[in-house]
């Protein structure tokens, strides 16, 4: 089952910021420059997390992933 996620990030370095934005375009839709809506399976979510961990520096950057519930649920 696919879940809808809201993902927001704050990346300190401009080069990493561009890399995160480019990576995110493959997983969801940009709502703002650093906020994405993603409909993901569990496997896709794990791939996304892995990709982000390859790019960000955990001591300098922040990523927040909020589970909004089933994709295509109420309010669609």
Please provide the spans of the model-predicted regions.
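Basic nucleic-acid-binding interfaces
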Residues: 1-6, 12-76
């Amino acid at each position: 089952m696919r879940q809808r996620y809201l993902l927001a990030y704050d990346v300190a370095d401009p080069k990493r910021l561009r890399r995160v934005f480019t990576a995110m375009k493959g997983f969801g839709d940009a709502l703002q420059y650093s906020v994405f809506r993603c409909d993901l399976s569990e496997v896709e979510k794990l791939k996304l997390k892995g990709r982000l961990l390859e790019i960000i520096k955990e001591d300098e950057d922040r990523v927040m992933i909020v589970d909004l519930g089933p994709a295509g649920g109420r309010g669609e």
